[in-house]
Amino acid sequence: MDSFSQKLNTYAQLAVEVGVNVQKGQYVVVNASTDVRDFVRLIVKHAYEKGAKNVTVNWQDDEVAKLKYELAPFEAFEEYPEWEAKGREELAKNGAAFISVVSSNPDLLKGIDSKRIAAFQKAAGKALHTYRQYIQSDKVSWTVVGAASAGWAHKVFPGKSEEEAIHLLWEEIFKATRVNEDNPVQAWINHDQNLHEKVDHLNERHYAALHYQAEGTDLTIKLPRKHVWAGAGSVNESGHEFMANMPTEEVFTLPQKDGVDGVVSSTKPLSYGGNIIENFTLTFENGRIVDIKAEKGEDILKELVETDEGSHYLGEVALVPYDSPISQSNILFYNTLFDENASNHLAIGSAYAFNIEGGKQMSREELVKEGLNESITHVDFMIGSKDMNIDGITADGKREPIFRNGNWAF
């Protein structure tokens, strides 16, 4: 086996063993593009070798998806197959593990009417709401990993041949996911422990609010009374550990739904719905987005915010140091899984139940009462920079440094 094949094999093994931590007799579901079938086959192989009972692959084809957006009647985007939504719910109910492989060309739907994209996102969000609750409350094991496709690689490395661009992107993915380490599994265990030290400190301090300051950003975010910081490894309902994102460099919690005030500016392009949104600013009053400006993709961003009532509010606050390995690579991935781990970020839309103390056991009404935002969407956008300072504000109004010049201050 050559060096690349070995790395690809190791990466697939990590997705199965560290990502979702497949258990004997478990169902496994893989969502992936036909563009990265060789990698997906390795995932399937390792899942069965770990004892999976049945591995199902939901294949997507980017070009087929694009043809639908170009040629299908508008009403096709206002519906989502009930059998597919119910199938996912049933699998989640039975404790399946879900692996999502992201590889799409960030410009796939460039030039497509934003209303078509918004209609589909809304229909899918509504249909998959119950399934996503299993995911967002960590009832089941799930992970998101990246795989290099020609379309994505060309965007990240323009001017290179297709073969070279794909090779370069794979190498960056391997670096970011610790595949190149002597013992990748142990490297992930060590990384998990390091992130949990930050989580423990923030949970101990239990700040009432955060204040962000940087060029184009002056934002105060109140945190719910029962907020909990999380990061790296998670534990599902059955007590099994898993790693929801590979890579991951973040520690995160949720904001008080109505407690966000001020202005925040993006620092990296946002890839959303097959389009790129760049250089945007959001203004908040009492938690709600009241003004949107973007140099590129403003219509797409506005459609996102108009998805439902909850998409006018934030659902996640995540801290990532400017000197994180992905940030230091100085590569813009045009993919949220990677770019969010190079930068502090926020998320428009739904919050995670596990970010509230006892949240996994709470009803929807109880969670809302505690300040959790509900939405059919959840979209991260990047706001971190090397000049960003963040203060933690205690219940009695004392300020303590969390970030200085883009990096941890404790």
UniProtKB/Swiss-Prot annotation:
Signal peptide interval: none
Binding site for a divalent metal cation 2: E316, E340, H378, D380
Pfam families found in the cross-reference section: Peptidase_M29
Residues the record lists as binding a divalent metal cation 1: E250, E316, E340, H345
Cofactor note: Binds 2 divalent metal cations per subunit. Can use cobalt, zinc, and possibly also magnesium ions.
InterPro entries: M29_Exopeptidase (IPR052170), M29_N-terminal (IPR035097), Peptidase_M29 (IPR000787)
SUPFAM superfamilies xref list: Thermophilic metalloprotease-like
Tagged with keyword Hydrolase: yes
Entry function: Metal-dependent exopeptidase.
UniProt similarity note: Belongs to the peptidase M29 family.
Protein name: Aminopeptidase AmpS
Species this protein is from: Bacillus subtilis (strain 168)
